[in-house]
Amino acid sequence: MTRLLIAASGTGGHLFPALAVADALDGHCQVSWLGVPDRLETELVPARFKLITVNAGGLQGRGITKLVQLIRLLAASITVRRLIRTHQIDAVFTTGGYIAAPAILGARWCGVPAVLHESNAIPGRVTRLLGRFCSAVAVGLPVAAGRIPGCRPVLTGTPVRSGFLNAQPLPDWVPSGAGPLLVVMGGSQGAIGLNRMVRAVLPELLEQGCRVVHLTGSNDPDVGELQHPRLVECRFSDDIPGLLQHADLAISRAGAGSLSELAVCGTPSILVPFPQAADQHQDANAACAAELGGAVIVHQHPPGHPALGNSIKRLLGARLGDTDSRPELLEQMRAGMDELAQRDADAQLARLLADLVR
């Protein structure tokens, strides 16, 4: 049986696509997982796969700071090389981020094929620097292909969890009624700014009959301040596939993972890119959906600014009784999201890995 090392760490945007690929390979590979101590993978991975952790970080800074980081990278790469040899690893798969650097270098050192998946429209620094050392590079969005020097990436899309690909019921805790369903995903990064934008426009929408599920993320101090029978606030939910499949409209950050989930569910979206994202990659991700007509981009703004409220009213107006609005807008956006979606990304990546180790 093929022995595969998956290197994915840190955020759901790196972990969930890797888990989807692992599911697609189920029964065909013996999977070991390379991660970093005290990150999300320590919660999600050990129940399913053997997790091995190394200390890995970025290469920011100058002088002594960068020297220390380079030494740490070398040490991590040596550890990965030893791991590959000890466990007789046949191939390495990584979804980028800090852990990708020692994984790719260790694989190169051992002559083992490495596959790198880049989900963002603007590739990360590790992808740009080390993509040329991989046996294959896959991208989630077409525009990324020309931004990775020294290699010829293949477009696969970004894998999503299986629940997003199968029809799901609307959770029974969602507010009932005939009004449109608005789902807000604050996200794990920078949720407070987006959440405050949304809360400023919710009272009017709720009074007009809109039903709202607001997933705030874990760092929002204002949870519970707004109360209404058609509003449910929660920090996280395991029912996101069902929520997105039944939502009339979603408001979300524009991380590549969230964008892929919205696309496969065909959910019309207002995307609010995280303004501090590296290289403004969320702006570029959002543009990919907007160019196909699947999303509207609203940049983060103070709560009193009218941009978000105006966009919601324009898109949901027909459902809220505005006779001057265009009811076909949401269906056109669903078609745009459907065009963006790549529903077999996990299977494509599984085939790519299988072909490399034959």
Curated annotation (Swiss-Prot):
One example GO MF annotation: undecaprenyldiphospho-muramoylpentapeptide beta-N-acetylglucosaminyltransferase activity
Binding site for UDP-N-acetyl-alpha-D-glucosamine: T11, G12, G13, N120, R161, S188, Q282
Gene Ontology CC, one term: plasma membrane
Entry's EC annotation: 2.4.1.227
Source superkingdom: Bacteria
Record-linked Gene3D superfamilies: Glycogen Phosphorylase B
Topology with respect to the bilayer: Peripheral membrane protein
HAMAP family the UniProt entry points to: MurG
Protein name: UDP-N-acetylglucosamine--N-acetylmuramyl-(pentapeptide) pyrophosphoryl-undecaprenol N-acetylglucosamine transferase
